[in-house]
Curated annotation (Swiss-Prot):
Heme b b566 binds at residues 97, 196. GO terms for molecular function: metal ion binding; ubiquinol-cytochrome-c reductase activity. It is found in: Mitochondrion inner membrane. It is a multi-pass membrane protein. Heme 1 (or BL or b562) is low-potential and absorbs at about 562 nm, and heme 2 (or BH or b566) is high-potential and absorbs at about 566 nm. Heme b b562 binds at residues 83, 182. It comes from Redunca redunca (Bohor reedbuck). It comes from the Eukaryota. This is Cytochrome b. Its cofactor is heme b. Keywords: Electron transport, Heme, Iron, Membrane, Metal-binding, Mitochondrion, Mitochondrion inner membrane, Respiratory chain, Transmembrane, Transmembrane helix, Transport, Ubiquinone.
Length: 379
């Protein structure tokens, strides 16, 4: 008799995705982040669900309800901080996952890559709306500044902003709709993640060499299941270290002050994972130009397959491209630092140079390096 996991309609799907899936024998720990993102998503949905049971999306009580969760709800503080720091872990895993894709040429799986970019946008939108919910100073002013960017759109801008606000400023209507969207989006993300996986399993995984691994496959279980469990344990270890020892390390102290439309904080800045994009936005003096640069800084990922001019898929055997890749990483770290600094003398020019460098590296320098490496192969 055939094993039930290979015949049962539901178990068959799980079996083909996580048990008998043929996987390359040489994928490194950089391939762990997909499963870690899945764990992060489930964790965020569960902690978010329990937070939603006690949260009220009304401007008068939102801040108090978060305080109530932390002080009066059994283990509410740990749920709240797991959710807040879980978002940070989510983005760390996302950036590593995207970086892996760029380094090893995984973007050549077009459908998988494009769904991934959509997933990135959806996750960023969810995180932004979630940051507004506690209704602290940075929540309110962050929402005001970022939604206001839409007013840069010619002709329909102002109407669009007021439509999103549900009034003439960020208020009760805005908070309520943001809560509704923040609740529904993770489930859409989950559905998209399944499509992401579906497309990936059409082609099979890439591997560090970028060469077809059809000649040497191993079953996903037990090899990669045990590897994923190790990754998950490390993820939970880091998350719980953050939650239990320094829960507010990555937060903003201003968010412990209730939202006040009459008092603007001296430095409005988003959560750390948006700072690189925020720095690019601020480095362009023109409002519309800044908004376009902000969107393009992430949308540029869609162009990666077009910008791939190398005869080799992976960067494993391409030293010049490797060097440029790590310069790009350093550049993004620089932008992240600049995004959190005030808009004054040394920081403005550093931000502008780092922004130019970012687009220059991706659009010009890396494709040029690829062609140079192609020619070096002929020698």
């Amino acid at each position: 008799m055939t094993n039930i996991r290979k015949t049962h309609p539901l178990m068959k799907i799980v079996n083909n995705a996580f048990i008998d899936l043929p996987a390359p024998s040489n994928i490194s720990s950089w391939w762990n982040f997909g499963s870690l993102l899945g764990i992060c998503l489930v964790l965020q949905i569960l902690t978010g669900l329990f937070l939603a049971m006690h949260y009220t999306s009304d401007t008068a009580t939102a801040f108090s309800s978060v305080t109530h969760i932390c002080r009066d709800v059994n283990y509410g503080w740990i749920i709240r901080y797991m959710h807040a720091n879980g978002a940070s872990m989510f983005f760390i895993c996302l950036f590593m996952h995207v970086g892996r894709g760029l380094y090893y040429g995984s973007y050549m799986f077009l459908e998988t890559w494009n769904i991934g970019v959509i997933l990135l946008f959806a996750t960023m939108a969810t995180a932004f709306m979630g940051y507004v919910l506690p209704w602290g100073q940075m929540s309110f002013w962050g929402a005001t500044v970022i939604t206001n960017l839409l007013s840069a759109i010619p002709y329909i801008g102002t109407n669009l902003v007021e439509w999103i606000w549900g009034g003439f400023s960020v208020d009760k209507a805005t908070l309520t709709r943001f809560f509704a969207f923040h609740f529904i989006l993770p489930f859409i993300i989950m559905a998209l993640a399944m499509v992401h996986l579906l497309f990936l399993h059409e082609t099979g995984s890439n591997n560090p060499t970028g060469i077809s691994s059809d000649v040497d496959k191993i079953p996903f279980h037990p090899y990669y299941t045990i590897k994923d469990i190790l990754g998950a344990l490390l993820l939970i270890l880091v998350l719980m270290l953050l939650v239990l020892f320094t829960p507010d390390l990555l937060g903003d102290p201003d968010n412990y002050t209730p939202a006040n439309p009459l008092n603007t904080p001296p430095h409005i800045k988003p959560e750390w994972y948006f700072l690189f994009a925020y720095a690019i936005l601020r480095s362009i003096p023109n409002k519309l130009g800044g908004v376009l640069a902000l969107i393009l800084s992430i949308l540029i990922l869609i162009l990666m397959p077009l910008l791939h001019l190398s005869k080799q898929r992976s960067m494993m055997f391409r030293p010049i491209s490797q060097c440029l890749f790590w310069i790009l990483v350093a550049d993004l770290l620089t932008l992240t630092w600049i995004g959190g600094q005030p808009v004054e003398h040394p920081y403005i020019i550093i931000g502008q140079l780092a922004s130019i460098m970012y687009f220059l590296l991706i659009l010009i320098l890396m494709p040029t390096a690829s062609t140079i490496e192609n020619n070096l192969l002929k020698w």
